[in-house]
């Protein structure tokens, strides 16, 4: 990453496209920074790009992406209204699991994406993205359970690709995705309640 910190997602995506911080830079075709609404209330974080993503430069461009689109649609959410990214910005060879060194190399990029998008809800897709926020617990015991992380609601769900290999997981994904709109409504109601009940409270920008 350059010496200066990007101020926008667009600047950050340019930096990612030039990244050579790990060996994945030697085998990738395209970097896959992220895609969607830069001011989204909902951010989805997957694990790593696959072969389709490596060719297009867009996250969730293959079969898992088609299922993700269906899950969002069933929940009344337009894909264009969310921001989607991955833990890794380059495809691992043969679609293997991300390595810890690769996750560490990409972590500053993801941290900046979260900071710049500033979502109300983050949906973690799969165990690697969930472990970024709560490494002490497993996805299997936490799936669908909303947790708070620095004021952001974290909703852990199975990766859509898992449901392609194990169709019995799809109903659970559908159920979990339907919680997103409820979370946003709760967030809006809380904000409205705070305005109504604390009209004289000043926001401390340094908290």
Predicted feature locations:
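Glycine-rich, small/polar surface segments that engage phosphate groups of diverse ligands
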Residues: 52-83
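Glycine/proline-rich loop-helix segments at beta-alpha junctions forming the active-site rim
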Residues: 2, 10, 17, 75, ...
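Short, mixed-charge, low-aromatic patches
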Residues: 22-29, 62-68, 130-139
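Active-site and ligand/interface coordination hotspots across diverse enzymes
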Residues: 1-63, 196-207
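Short N-terminal helix-initiation segments at or just after the protein's N-terminus
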Residues: 29-32, 66-68, 99-104
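Short acidic-hydrophobic sequence patches enriched in Asp/Glu that either
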Residues: 8, 60-67, 102, 172
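A sequence-composition feature that detects small, non-aromatic residues
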Residues: 25, 40, 48, 61-64, ...
């Amino acid at each position: 990453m350059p010496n200066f910190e990007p101020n926008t997602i667009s600047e950050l995506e340019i930096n990612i496209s030039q990244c050579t911080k790990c060996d994945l830079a030697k085998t990738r075709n395209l970097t896959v920074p992220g895609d969607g609404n830069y001011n989204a209330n909902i951010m989805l974080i997957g694990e790593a790009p696959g072969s389709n993503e490596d060719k297009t430069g867009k996250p969730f461009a293959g079969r898992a992406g088609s299922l993700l689109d269906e899950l969002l649609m069933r929940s009344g959410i337009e894909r264009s209204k969310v921001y989607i990214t991955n833990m890794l910005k380059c495809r691992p060879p043969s679609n293997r699991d991300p390595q810890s060194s690769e996750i560490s190399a990409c972590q500053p990029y993801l941290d900046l994406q979260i900071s710049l998008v500033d979502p109300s809800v983050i949906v973690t897709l799969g165990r690697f993205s969930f472990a970024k926020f709560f490494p002490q617990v497993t996805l299997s015991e936490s799936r669908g359970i909303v947790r708070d992380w620095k004021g952001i609601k974290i909703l852990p769900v199975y990766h859509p690709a898992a449901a392609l290999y194990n169709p019995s997981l799809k109903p659970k994904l559908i159920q979990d995705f339907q919680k997103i709109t409820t979370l946003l409504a709760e967030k809006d109601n809380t904000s409205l309640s705070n305005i109504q009940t604390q009209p004289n409270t000043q926001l401390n920008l340094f908290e």
